[in-house]
Amino acid sequence: MEKLNNFDNFVNKNFKISIAFFALGLFFGIVYSINLLGFSLNSETLNPANMRAIHISLMLYGFIPLMLSYLPFLLINKEVGFDKEGLRYLNLYTIFWYIFLVFMVVSLLLGKNRGLAFYDFAYELNFLLALAGVFYIIALYKFIRLYKRFLYG
C-alpha cells in the first residue's frame, strides 16, 4: 500500500478509479437502452435483464454512493485536518468496496439471474459490504477524534 500522507491525493486517486465504475454503469445502461429500442444483441450474457440489473446496481452501489461516503471526511479534513491512521482505514474501506463492485458485476453477468431490477447479485457479497462498513466506522471514529484534539488541545 502506498504511503497515504495527503487526503487530497487519496480523494483524487479514488475519484479517477470510481469514474471507471460510473463509465461501466453508463455503458451497460446504453446497451440496455439499445435493447429497449429493438436492436437485440443475440447474447445470453448481454441479455436485457442482466444489463438492467448491472446498470441499476452500479448506479446504486457505484460512483455516487462511494463519493458521498467521503463527504464527512472531506468536511472534517476542511475543519481540523486528517488522521493518517483514519485515512488508512478509509483506504481499506474503499478497497473492499471496489472488490465488492467487481464481484457484483461478475456475479450479475455470469451468475444466476432472478430477474430483479437491482440487488440481484449473490447474497454472499453482503459480507464484503459489511466488512467495508466496519472499516468505514473505524475511519470515521479516527477522524472524529480529531475534534477532541482540536477543541481541547
Model-derived features with residue positions:
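Hydrophobic alpha-helical transmembrane segments of multi-pass integral membrane proteins
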Residues: 1-153
